[in-house]
């Protein structure tokens, strides 16, 4: 029997509970889950690649007793990485209509590049629909509590990475 390999790609800067929810649910759809941590030169990540890989490896550790999980960095065209990994499906999480529009277009292009690879969309659990890495970073930068959006380890990493940022100067 052919092993069902799924690939869940993302920047994971930082890793959120929404990402974790999609990983947990995706792990039930396959025999092996590969989490691809993207190097995206167009983005200016808060965390380096090694830190992002470590964050993901930490949260997927509990899955490893029931499914094979691998965390790999990648750069370049996603479909090439999927092919290299031998995956037959790309997993994407959807929070809102705006996500769908973008992901629908990407899925269509990936299908044109390789029609043998399916894109599987998982709707975000309602409690995670408003969580976005971009917003988590912004809240953390402004001194807000992000513990309800990320794991304790990621919360600590955010605090440590932002410790050098001083309080904003008051205009009075």
Per-segment meaning from a language model:
Residues 36, 88-97:
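Acidic beta-strand-to-loop metal/phosphate-binding motif
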Residues 131-150:
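Short, glycine-/small-residue-rich phosphate/pyrophosphate-handling segment
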Residues 50-52, 102-108:
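Charged helix-capping and loop-helix junction motifs
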Residues 16, 56, 143:
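Residue-level signal for inorganic ion chemistry
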Residues 163-172:
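Single conserved hydrophobic/aromatic residue that forms the stacking wall/gate
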Residues 115-130:
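Short, flexible loop segments at boundaries between secondary-structure elements
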Residues 6-18:
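Short, glycine-rich nucleotide/cofactor-binding loops
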Residues 20-78:
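Short, surface-exposed acidic-centric catalytic microdomains
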